[in-house]
Structure formats: structure tokens, C-alpha cells
């Protein structure tokens, strides 16, 4: 039996007993209690360089930065192997994979038996959210992957201080992770151990996470999607708050008025770019600051406003397409201390990916560690960077405020070639929830599967809601009602809800809207709507701006182009709204009646387009 040897700074008997129990099951060669120190980080990096898991990059150009190349079979989240094992199947709902908890436990007990043989088990303590915040949650991840241990140090508040908050009897979310590649004595390890069989399992009632077979980010960094969205959304439903797949940004106008906006886009629809937006020419005196680029935890305040924190401490961003033109703030964030995964590397040890520069450098080594072949992808489409959020030049002064920041508006948007206009404002909270619930987006490389097919991705939470999606819609409706009453009493208002689509195409298939920094023009109109000073036209699908309602200083974007991306087609909208029935039927009896009623009203309204 492996010695647990808990250090003095761990004073939590229940935690120590749990580590003992998991060690008994997984049988690691040794146990290491992570303290989050610089020394520990460097030691684990050096260990991975020696093992061939990582390589040091050019330290002049990329100080403190390293590259890991994963196994080609382990490159993205595996939605078909992700389970919500609630006690009752109907509590997981039709959009989640479900297995009876006792069946799954029996299966996992068999798989985890001896799964860490020959490896070190790392005990990784982490806080999602600022340490000690009333919105934060503590997790402990037991993993046999040093890649996970070093990545968690960037993505969460990881280290000794977590145990001070935890004390002797604090609550924590238990997370168990294995790459599922036990080593027999004397057996040589591979650079990226993983297993063709994969399970990412959540038990919402007992707040446990078990992950088997994958070393990749979203499947292995269990504080991220697993805790911060799937488990946290189930907690939020019980406790009256929201865990959302949203960026949070602050907008300050030249008058000094500041608003915080939370926005939900599916993966690879530009969340990180939008969160770090740089205002374009014509917007001197405006400022955009970043609170978070991926996840928001939102709790109602006593004043009836909704307050959000970014539970993460780092960015785990998609590298391809990122460059000094599309996201200068992000590129500046990557100036040092980055862990890259599945990008290409130049012969002098610099990183490269599609979209970083027009010219492909000569003698590239691709993400599989082989010489790059022209016409093939040098970096994997889902290649990532992992970096501390504090390095971002646009980071908001309040990004770690334990009380959170007050949200003025929610934005929902997907990747649609037609139908959905550039921007529209919902008529009211119920209408906004309907629009978010029926969001559609063309599929991308961030999930394994087909590309270019429109799938419904409610609230951009389809892969991340930890309970029945119909109950999730109901939770949004109920929360709106409760918070709305509180807000009214305090003289405040519920956040406005907007829909955007940066991705409309013309007849030749080209994007019409320039996007990136130009999205500031849409953001300004939204802020002015919140402040009650911008015009809008009422249409069957919401309030929309005219060409004259937007600020075009510094650009020659024409009225014809604007009309092209804001036009509403009666036939397209009838097809669109009728297609929502498929999702609603899938959700069955638990679907809130208010949404079905809203669908009927919309169907009648769009006949008038």
C-alpha cells in the first residue's frame, strides 16, 4: 500500500482518508501533495522534458514557455464519452448521456483498479474563483498526469493557500483523473500516455468527478468544464445562481460610464477575441477590459442586480487564427510562461499555427512531431495555449473582486451563415431566454464530430449543463422573475438580453461583417440601449438598429452591406422557428410552457416579415 504521508499543511481528516481510499484503488507508486510553488512547477516541467512529454521553446522568444504534443487520438473534448450520472435518468435529461450511478460506479471501480500503477499520484488542491470568495468553490484533483498538475496551476488558484481556506472540515469537490496507462515494472513510458477507452463522469448529487483515459484539457483539467460548468450548474440550480459558458468584459465610454457584459458563444465563435477586444479607429477614449473569456458564475445581489465572477485563473484558448491583428491583447498575454499544446514549432524553437502569419515558416515541425507537409495542417485546429489571466494587458482591475462585477447585459450568439441578423434585442426576459434556448451554431473543431452542420446549442451550454436542459431553461425563467422583483424594489433593472451573429455570409460565401474590433460598434449600441438613449426598430424577432443607429466613424462599411446582414427572410425565419420544435420535443414534458407559448407567438409574428 502506497504511503499517503500528508504534509502538515493538510489538516482535513476526511480529505486525507479519501486520498488513502483512492490510492488503495488506483495503486500509484507514490503520492505527491502539490503546494503550487515555483520550484514544484519547474521540477514537474523538467520531469516532462526528460520524459519527452514537453519540449522547451526558444527561451529568448518564449521565456518560460513549453510545448506538449498530445497523442493524435486525444485532442478534444469527448462529448459522447461524457456522462451525467444523476440518481434519476430524467434529471440528466435528453441532451446528456446518462448511466445509473451504481452501474457506472461498478464499471469505473473495475477500470480504476490499479490504473496508476508505476506512476505518481499528484494531489492538486484548487479554488475556482478568488480564494475565500463567497462565490468560489474548492476542488481537489487526484491525477497521475504532471501535465494536469502544471496546467491547473495556471487555470485555477492552485496550492497551499487552498488548504488554509479548507481548514479541517471545509467542503470540496472530489475529482479523480487518470490517463489510464499503468506501467509495469521496468516498462518504458510513452510521451503522451492515454487510453482509447475514455469516460468523463459526473455525479451531481454527490458532487464527484471521475475522468478516465484522456490527458487533454477539457477532459483532464477537472476544474474547468467538469466542475465550473457541469457540477456548478447543478449546484447553482439548487442554490439560486448560474454557472454559465460566458465571457465577461467591462466597457468604459469616454464619459467614464462603465458596464459589464456577459456573453455566451459556443466554442470557436470568438469568445476570447471578444473578451479582449481593442476598440477600432473612431473609438478613442473607449476602453474594453477583460474579466474572463470562458466561464462566468453569476449570483443575485441584495440590490437585485446579478454579480459575476470568472472562476478561472487562466486562459485555455484556441491558438489557430490568433494573431496580432485578430487579438493583439491575447498575443501580448502570450509573451512568457505559456504551456502550448499541439501547435507547430519552427526550427529555431518558436511556436507557429495557421493564421499566425501569412507565410508558413520553412522546416516546420508539425503538431505530431513530424516534418510539416505543405497542404496539411501544421497545428491541430484545436491546438491550445494555457496562460495565467493576470498576464493579459486588458485584464480588468476587478477581475478578482470576490464580490463579482454587476452585469448590465447578456449577449448570446452563434455561427450562422444566414437567417439571424447582426444584432437584435429581446423584447423581455422570457423572449431573451427563448432566443438563448434555441441558439444554433455551425459545428466546429473544439468537439469531436462533423463540421459545418447547424446544431442547437442552448445558451452555448449543450455539452456543459449538469442537469436536465428543460429544468435549466426553467431555472433561468424563475431566476429572472425573482431577481426582477428584487431589482424593481431597489430601483434597478434586469440585464437586457441581446442576440448577435458576426458570421452572416454573402451569395459568394464570404463573411460580410469584419468582426473583431469592429464588434465595438454593436457593443456601443447595446450600452446605449441599456442607458435608454439609443433608437431601435421593433421587428417580429426583436428590436434592431437601423444603419443610422450605429456609429460608423473610422470605417466605410456601407448601408448595403449592413442591410445584407440585418435582413430578415420570412421563409428562413419560419423554417428556423419550426426547427426549434425538434429540440422542444426532445426535452418533452418538462419544457417550460412559457417557451412553447413564445414559439407560437413568434411563428405568428414572422408571417408579417
From Swiss-Prot:
GO BP terms in the entry: cellular response to glucose stimulus; gluconeogenesis; glycerol biosynthetic process from pyruvate; oxaloacetate metabolic process; propionate catabolic process; response to lipid; response to starvation
Record GO terms (molecular function): GTP binding; manganese ion binding; phosphoenolpyruvate carboxykinase (GTP) activity
UniProt-annotated catalytic positions: 269
One Pfam family recorded for the sequence: PEPCK_N
UniProt cofactor(s): Mn(2+)
Record text on cofactor binding: Binds 1 Mn(2+) ion per subunit.
Binding-site list for substrate: 77, 216-218, 267, 382-384
Residues binding Mn(2+): 225, 245, 294
EC numbers on record: 4.1.1.32
SUPFAM superfamilies cross-referenced by the UniProt entry: PEP carboxykinase N-terminal domain, PEP carboxykinase-like
Pathway as given in its UniProt record: Carbohydrate biosynthesis; gluconeogenesis
InterPro entries: PEP_carboxykin_GTP_CS, PEP_carboxykinase_C, PEP_carboxykinase_GTP, PEP_carboxykinase_GTP_C, PEP_carboxykinase_GTP_N, PEP_carboxykinase_N
Name of the top EC class for this enzyme: lyase
PROSITE patterns named in the record: PEPCK_GTP
Keywords on record: Cytoplasm, Decarboxylase, Gluconeogenesis, GTP-binding, Lyase, Manganese, Metal-binding, Nucleotide-binding
Catalysed reaction, written as an equation: oxaloacetate + GTP = phosphoenolpyruvate + GDP + CO2
Subunit structure: Monomer.
Protein task: Catalyzes the conversion of oxaloacetate (OAA) to phosphoenolpyruvate (PEP), the rate-limiting step in the metabolic pathway that produces glucose from lactate and other precursors derived from the citric acid cycle.
Protein name: Phosphoenolpyruvate carboxykinase [GTP]
Amino acid at each position: 500500500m502506497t504511503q499517503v504521508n500528508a504534509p502538515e499543511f493538510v489538516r482535513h481528516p476526511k480529505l486525507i482518508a479519501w486520498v488513502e481510499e483512492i490510492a488503495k484503488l488506483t495503486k500509484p507508486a507514490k503520492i505527491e501533495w502539490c503546494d503550487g510553488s515555483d520550484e514544484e512547477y519547474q521540477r514537474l516541467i523538467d520531469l516532462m522534458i526528460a520524459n519527452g512529454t514537453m519540449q522547451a521553446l526558444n527561451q529568448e522568444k518564449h521565456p518560460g514557455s513549453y510545448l506538449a504534443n498530445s497523442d493524435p487520438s486525444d485532442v478534444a473534448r469527448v462529448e459522447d464519452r461524457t456522462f451525467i450520472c444523476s440518481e434519476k435518468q430524467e434529471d440528466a435529461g435528453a441532451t446528456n448521456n446518462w448511466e445509473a450511478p451504481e452501474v457506472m460506479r461498478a464499471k469505473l471501480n473495475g477500470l480504476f483498479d490499479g490504473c496508476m500503477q508505476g506512476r505518481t499520484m499528484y494531489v492538486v488542491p484548487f479554488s475556482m474563483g478568488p480564494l475565500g470568495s463567497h462565490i468560489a468553490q474548492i476542488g481537489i484533483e487526484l491525477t497521475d498526469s504532471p501535465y494536469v498538475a502544471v496546467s491547473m496551476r495556471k487555470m485555477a488558484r492552485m496550492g497551499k493557500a487552498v488548504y488554509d481556506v479548507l481548514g479541517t472540515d471545509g467542503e470540496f469537490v472530489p475529482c479523480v483523473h487518470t490517463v489510464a496507462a499503468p506501467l509495469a515494472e521496468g516498462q518504458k513510458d510513452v510521451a503522451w500516455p492515454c487510453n482509447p477507452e475514455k469516460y468523463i463522469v459526473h455525479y451531481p448529487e454527490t458532487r464527484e468527478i471521475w475522468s478516465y483515459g484522456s490527458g487533454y484539457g477539457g477532459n483532464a483539467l477537472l476544474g474547468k468544464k467538469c466542475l465550473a460548468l457541469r457540477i456548478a450548474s447543478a449546484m447553482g440550480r439548487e442554490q439560486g445562481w448560474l454557472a454559465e459558458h460566458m465571457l465577461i468584459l467591462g466597457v468604459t465610454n469616454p464619459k467614464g460610464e462603465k458596464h459589464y457584459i456577459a456573453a455566451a458563444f459556443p466554442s470557436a465563435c470568438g469568445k476570447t477575441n471578444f473578451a479582449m477586444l481593442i476598440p477600432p479607429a473612431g473609438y478613442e477614449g473607449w476602453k474594453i477590459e477583460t474579466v474572463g473569456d470562458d466561464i462566468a458564475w453569476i449570483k443575485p445581489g441584495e440590490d437585485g442586480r446579478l454579480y459575476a465572477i470568472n472562476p478561472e485563473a487562466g486562459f485555455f484558448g484556441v491558438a489557430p487564427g490568433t494573431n496580432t491583428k485578430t487579438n493583439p491583447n491575447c498575443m501580448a498575454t502570450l509573451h512568457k510562461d505559456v504551456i502550448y499544446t499541439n501547435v507547430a514549432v519552427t526550427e529555431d524553437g518558436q511556436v507557429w499555427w495557421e493564421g499566425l502569419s501569412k507565410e508558413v515558416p520553412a522546416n516546420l515541425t508539425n503538431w505530431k512531431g513530424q516534418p510539416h507537409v505543405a497542404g496539411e495542417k501544421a497545428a491541430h485546429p484545436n491546438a491550445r495555449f494555457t496562460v495565467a489571466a493576470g498576464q493579459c494587458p486588458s485584464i480588468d482591475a476587478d477581475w478578482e473582486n470576490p464580490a463579482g462585477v454587476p452585469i448590465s447585459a447578456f449577449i448570446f450568439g452563434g455561427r450562422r451563415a444566414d437567417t439571424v441578423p447582426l444584432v437584435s434585442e429581446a423584447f423581455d426576459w422570457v423572449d431573451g431566454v427563448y432566443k438563448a434556448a434555441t441558439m444554433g451554431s455551425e459545428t466546429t473543431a473544439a468537439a469531436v464530430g462533423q463540421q459545418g452542420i447547424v446544431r442547437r446549442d442552448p445558451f452555448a451550454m449543450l455539452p456543459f449543463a449538469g442537469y436536465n436542459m428543460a429544468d435549466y431553461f426553467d431555472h433561468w425563467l424563475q431566476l429572472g422573475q425573482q431577481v426582477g422583483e428584487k431589482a424593481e424594489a431597489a430601483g434597478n433593472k434586469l440585464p437586457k438580453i441581446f442576440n448577435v451573429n458576426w458570421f452572416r455570409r454573402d451569395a459568394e460565401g464570404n463573411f460580410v461583417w469584419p468582426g473583431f474590433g469592429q464588434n465595438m460598434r454593436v457593443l456601443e449600441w447595446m450600452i446605449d440601449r441599456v442607458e435608454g438613449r439609443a433608437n431601435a426598430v421593433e421587428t417580429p424577432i426583436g428590436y434592431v438598429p437601423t444603419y443610422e443607429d450605429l456609429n460608423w466613424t473610422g470605417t466605410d462599411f456601407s448601408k448595403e452591406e449592413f442591410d445584407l446582414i440585418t435582413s430578415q427572410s420570412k421563409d428562413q425565419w419560419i423554417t428556423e422557428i419550426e426547427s426549434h420544435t425538434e429540440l422542444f420535443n426532445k426535452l418533452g414534458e418538462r419544457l417550460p410552457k412559457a417557451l412553447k407559448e413564445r414559439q407560437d407567438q413568434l411563428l405568428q409574428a414572422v408571417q408579417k416579415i
